[in-house]
């Protein structure tokens, strides 16, 4: 399907600041289909985690979208793929008790209203397992795609296409005024690690609740989308508290 040319750049969302991140994809045909979905909707930054090189089947299914594949970047882990981005939106088919999950429409609206100049990652997981808890913990926001109750999940390429098409086509104003950018994900993660370390030293986090509390903390601080000013304040507070404990 060819999209109307005149509608391609009228929504003001700045497609160049969005990256599609595929974590641990297995089927290279799906990677090619994702590239095609990106080219159809005007997005070009594809990041692959856990993939060393693309196989021929990826190029076979890309169909006139080979440039997206040729420019794709490869990362050894999710932290490396997201460290320079400001906000991460992760798609999941399962509702998790420890992660606040947004409806798709809310996620799209939040994406469109993200601060001008912020770099945003759209994170999608492995075809069989989806995103693991550790991967969801690297996101600021987690969302689900609407689907019939009897169908457990979308194909990877379909999930990417639905998300990108919603960003591409739905009307809505661009951000009307400059906002403070969130800190990069690398800086946000450093802050979260300090908070978790303090909670562990205080005894609040222990062996029995470590996974649950850690996921709750990551979900909370992710949704706050800490700015550099927020991060510096929290780091100062928690680092000072840690230093006092050492004395």
Locate the predicted segments by residue.
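Post-transcriptional modification and biogenesis factors for structured RNAs
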Residues: 1-247
């Amino acid at each position: 399907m060819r999209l109307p040319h005149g509608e391609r750049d009228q929504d003001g969302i700045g497609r160049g600041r969005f990256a599609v991140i595929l974590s641990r994809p297995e089927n290279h045909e799906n990677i090619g289909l994702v590239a095609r979905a990106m080219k159809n909707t005007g997005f070009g930054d594809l990041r692959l985690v856990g993939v060393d090189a693309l196989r021929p089947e990826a190029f076979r299914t890309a169909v006139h979208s080979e440039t997206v594949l040729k420019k794709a970047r490869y990362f050894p882990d999710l932290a490396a793929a997201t460290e320079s981005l400001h906000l991460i939106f992760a798609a999941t088919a399962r509702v998790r008790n420890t992660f606040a999950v947004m409806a798709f429409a809310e996620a799209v609206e939040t994406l469109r209203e993200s601060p001008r100049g912020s770099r945003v990652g759209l994170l999608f997981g492995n075809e069989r397992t989806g995103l693991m808890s550790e991967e969801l913990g690297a996101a600021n926001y987690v969302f689900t795609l609407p689907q019939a109750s009897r169908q457990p999940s979308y194909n990877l390429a379909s999930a990417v296409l639905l998300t990108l098409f919603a960003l591409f086509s739905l009307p809505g104003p661009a951000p009307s005024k400059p906002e403070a950018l969130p800190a990069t994900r690398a800086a946000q993660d450093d802050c979260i690690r300090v908070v978790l370390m303090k909670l562990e030293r205080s005894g609040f986090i222990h062996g029995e609740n470590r996974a649950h509390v850690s996921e709750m903390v990551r979900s909370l601080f992710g949704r706050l989308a800490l700015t550099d000013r927020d991060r510096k304040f929290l780091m100062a507070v928690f680092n000072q508290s840690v230093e006092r404990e050492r004395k």
